[in-house]
Amino acid sequence: SQTSAAGQLLGDEIKGRIDPATSSLGQTVANGILIHRRIDRLADDHPLHCELRGLFAGRHRRYAGIVVDIGLDHALARTWRAFNAEPLEAFATRLSVQVGQEWPTAALGREAPAHARFARLLTGYTQASGMTRALAHVEQRLRRPVDLVPLADTVIAQRAQFEGAVGPILDDLLRAIENRPPAPRLAERQ
């Protein structure tokens, strides 16, 4: 969607209530964070997301949503051309520049991610190694030690299921964000 790239990036990091009208992050970034949170909620509630979370059982069930999100990022990067005419590399470069332009340095007390490094991070999701790097990063942010990296094997083994879910989930998320009526489910069309 057309929203703040910095807000989308900060959506998982910035916690608590945000009022865009008074936020030190600025109205555009604050709105981007709120949109990111809405998209996350909608994605987590999507039937295909729920189905993919079912692939992870036992002690990993608690982290299934995170792994599915990263697995879907991997699937989207791998199937990018099916959803966007702009090459992934060009998109990643454009997005990294936008993040830098919007970044609320004063409010956060730190600089935006380096353009080239951030663009490589995004395009890195095309490879399984990009997914494992993301899972390792999540491990470092968790309060309790959890070994998430091996769960990438499940995503790889179920790659077709993840790649098949990307399109319907994206369509439904865009429809919800743009307030369009839902498309009939496959079973309803038959």
What are these regions (language model features)?
Residues 52-116:
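Active-site-proximal alpha-helical scaffolds that flank and shape metal-associated catalytic sites
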Residues 1-80, 154-189:
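An N-terminal structural lobe/cap that precedes and organizes the functional/catalytic core
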Residues 22, 83-85, 146-148:
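Short, surface-exposed acidic
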Residues 90-175, 179:
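An amphipathic alpha-helical core segment
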Residues 1, 26, 46, 83, ...:
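Alpha-helix initiation/capping motif
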